[in-house]
A protein has these predicted regions:
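Intrinsically disordered, low-complexity terminal/linker regions enriched in Pro/Ser/Gly
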Residues: 126, 152-209
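Signature of dsDNA virion morphogenesis modules
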Residues: 1-167
Length: 209
């Protein structure tokens, strides 16, 4: 598997879609959410390679799908989230399975991994500035086009080769290390998921979903 450090987003900075995020709000959603804390303790806070989106106009995402990362969709795990200045940083480790291997190979091939919040939130006006206030942070996914300019990989990937033993046979994950710079444009999407509170929305920070 491949491990690297990243920024997930920044705070109190106007993003490319003219919105702000509050650091205390986001950090509180991480520290005070029993689900996220449990997932972090078990190394099980996973994200997907792109946000979950309907594949047809008529298709709708269920609340269960929005709030969960199915095992077959796991691309990476988020570890050691931390505040660094006005940014949320974390360590990323590629997941096992086909999707995780694909994610890791893209990073090895030179793609700079990008990250984007998946959250239930409300929009508020703070001294004339539009702030996204999270009610529940679900995870961070890795789209091609995130909305926060800083939300990208910040270190070269480190490959870990771990023995896999089955009966009397053993093998190693085939992972190489390399990284090149890239600049990714971004855009933010708000998709209403039909909560009783019309101001409550699903935040998916991605481009042209």
């Amino acid at each position: 598997y491949v491990t690297f450090d990243t920024y997930l987003q920044d705070f109190d900075v106007l993003n490319r879609n003219k919105r702000y995020y509050d650091g205390d709000n986001v950090w509180g959603c991480i520290k005070n959410d029993m689900r996220i804390q449990s997932l972090l303790q078990s190394n099980g806070w996973f994200g997907e390679f792109e946000h979950p989106v309907p594949m047809t106009v008529s298709e709708k995402l269920s609340p269960e799908r929005i709030k969960n990362v199915p095992p077959e969709k796991r691309a990476f795990k988020i570890m050691n989230p931390r505040i660094e200045g006005n940014k949320l940083a974390a360590t990323i480790q590629s997941a096992q399975g086909e999707v995780g291997e694909g994610f890791g190979k893209e990073v090895v091939a030179g793609w700079i991994a990008q990250f984007s919040a998946r959250a239930i939130a409300v929009m508020t006006n703070r001294n004339g500035k539009p702030y996204v206030m999270m009610k529940q942070l679900i995870t961070y996914d890795s789209p091609w086009f995130p909305s926060h300019e800083v939300a990208h990989q910040t270190s070269s990937p480190k490959a870990t080769f771990k023995p896999f033993i089955e009966s009397v046979k053993s093998g190693l994950n085939d992972v190489k290390t390399a990284v090149e710079a890239a600049v990714i444009p971004l855009k933010e999407i708000l998709t209403n998921i039909g909560h009783s509170d019309p101001s409550t929305q699903l935040i998916l920070e991605s481009f042209d979903l």
